[in-house]
């Protein structure tokens, strides 16, 4: 691996860490930064290896979220004692939230991989996700009833879990769909975000681990450093991104992210349809 090749791994790891849990679609950013610009398939000598690299850096982001919420997971699993009295988020909330997307993923995973991973379909997901986020902010200007994740009901967990199914469409964004659903259910943005990230860790880890196991043969010994650099960058910037997002989301809400998504749609559309960059993805 040359220095400039490792810089590509660093850039993609940073992009993954910054975008995986923000409601801006990490898939859209990977198309823009990798498929249209850096093109790691040429660095790693195959599209399969490039796809495997994306799985590895996504795992870096997942570990970042797991680290941020480590005490919460330990509480839910009864490994660590709860520090406060009263209602608490429990394992059943998470399980209920995971059921809809888990079932849909098992049923349609192959179809999604074959038919929905293209630039036009991702652009549709980006745009529709942005519209949902705008609607969530516009139609929920009243006082929220659920101010912390510990106050949420099982019904809210189920509806948010159903909304997570929208994220099976590439580009829609898991956090965009679930935070929007939470806000429409009268949760404040921080509470909806907390549940989104906590719920995402187990299902994303399971999906990524399954994908990595199926593609492990595409990781070659002379490319290990490339994967390590990307993973570490995704983890570090994932931690920073999640902490910053959670500290700001109640103030800035979803609208700025929705506007950013629409700008991203325009940029990718111009490059793809106007200049033919990324054709064949």
UniProtKB/Swiss-Prot annotation:
**Compartments in which it is found:** Cell membrane
- Which InterPro entries does this chain map to? UppP (IPR003824)
Name of the molecule in the record:
Undecaprenyl-diphosphatase
**Transmembrane regions:** 49-69, 92-112, 116-136, 152-172, 196-216, 224-244, 257-277
Which reactions appear under catalytic activity for this entry? di-trans,octa-cis-undecaprenyl diphosphate + H2O = di-trans,octa-cis-undecaprenyl phosphate + phosphate + H(+)
The organism that produces this protein has a lineage beginning with: Bacteria, Bacillati, Bacillota, Bacilli, Bacillales
Give a short account of what the protein does: Catalyzes the dephosphorylation of undecaprenyl diphosphate (UPP). Confers resistance to bacitracin.
What keywords are assigned to this protein?
A: Antibiotic resistance, Cell membrane, Cell shape, Cell wall biogenesis/degradation, Hydrolase, Membrane, Peptidoglycan synthesis, Transmembrane, Transmembrane helix
Q: Anything else of interest in the record?
A: Bacitracin is thought to be involved in the inhibition of peptidoglycan synthesis by sequestering undecaprenyl diphosphate, thereby reducing the pool of lipid carrier available.
Please give the biological process terms from Gene Ontology that the record holds: cell wall organization; peptidoglycan biosynthetic process; regulation of cell shape; response to antibiotic
Its encoding gene is what?
uppP
Q: Does the keyword Zinc apply?
A: no
Q: Which EC number(s) does UniProt give?
A: 3.6.1.27
Family of this protein:
Belongs to the UppP family.
Q: How does it sit in the membrane?
A: Multi-pass membrane protein
């Amino acid at each position: 691996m040359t220095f400039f090749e490792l810089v590509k791994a660093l850039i993609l790891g940073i992009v993954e860490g910054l975008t995986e849990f923000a409601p801006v679609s990490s898939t859209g950013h990977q198309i823009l930064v990798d498929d249209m610009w850096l093109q790691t398939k040429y660095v790693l000598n195959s599209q399969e290896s490039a796809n495997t690299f994306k799985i590895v850096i996504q795992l870096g982001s997942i570990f970042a979220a797991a680290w941020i919420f480590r005490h919460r997971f330990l509480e839910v699993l009864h490994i660590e004692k709860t520090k406060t009295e009263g209602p608490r988020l429990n394992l059943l909330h998470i399980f209920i939230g995971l059921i809809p997307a888990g079932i849909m993923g098992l049923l349609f995973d192959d179809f999604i991989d074959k038919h929905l991973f293209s630039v036009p379909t991702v652009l549709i997901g980006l745009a529709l996700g942005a519209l949902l986020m705008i609607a969530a902010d516009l139609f929920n200007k009243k006082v929220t009833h659920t101010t912390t994740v510990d106050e949420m009901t099982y019904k809210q967990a189920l509806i948010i879990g159903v909304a997570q199914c929208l994220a099976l469409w590439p580009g829609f964004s898991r956090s965009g769909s679930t935070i929007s659903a939470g806000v429409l259910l009268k949760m404040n943005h921080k509470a909806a975000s907390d549940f989104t990230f906590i719920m995402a860790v187990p299902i994303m880890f399971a999906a990524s681990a399954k994908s990595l196991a199926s593609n492990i043969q595409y990781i070659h010994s002379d490319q290990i450093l490339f994967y390590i650099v990307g993973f570490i960058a995704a983890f570090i910037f994932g931690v920073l991104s999640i902490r910053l997002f959670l500290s700001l989301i109640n103030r800035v809400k979803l609208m700025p992210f929705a506007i950013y998504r629409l700008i991203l749609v325009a940029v990718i559309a111009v490059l793809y349809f106007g200049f033919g960059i990324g054709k064949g993805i």
